[in-house]
Amino acid sequence: MEWKVVDTVISPSTGVSFSCIHSLKNLRLTLWYQADVYMPPGSIIIPFNKGVLINDKLYPVTVYNVTRFNPVLWKSLKENSHCPGNCNPKPEACSYPFECLVSVCPFGLTRNIQIDNKKV
């Protein structure tokens, strides 16, 4: 089944991405998955047994949970993610003040923050 990504939120404190996806049958779900893969809004995704096709390219994805879309939960996810990349317009550098658990920034933001004398 083909799905369209409506919106995606990255959580730097957990390393989890949340995507609101919509099917042609008017079903809306929230997908919780490892943030190593970014599903940008407008992308077409198709689930496969070894991952997901995102705009016709296969990516391995670790899915943690799939739930019916809940607008109240989605609003809370957006308000509490604190990832600067989730903002519009996107900043030039990451200003997240804590260690980010996303291995590679999907927004391409660089970090100039040190925690305990270690650049994170």
From Swiss-Prot:
Chain's gene name: iraM
InterPro entries assigned to the protein according to its UniProt record, in alphabetical order: Anti-adapter_IraM, PmrD_sf
Purpose: Involved in the stabilization of the sigma stress factor RpoS.
Source domain of life: Bacteria
Gene Ontology CC terms: cytoplasm
Keyword Membrane: no
Name recorded for this polypeptide: Anti-adapter protein IraM
Gene3D superfamilies from the UniProt entry: 2.40.50.650
Protein family (similarity comment): Belongs to the IraM/RssC family.
Record key words, sorted: Cytoplasm, Stress response
Location within or outside the cell: Cytoplasm
GO BP term (any one): cellular response to starvation
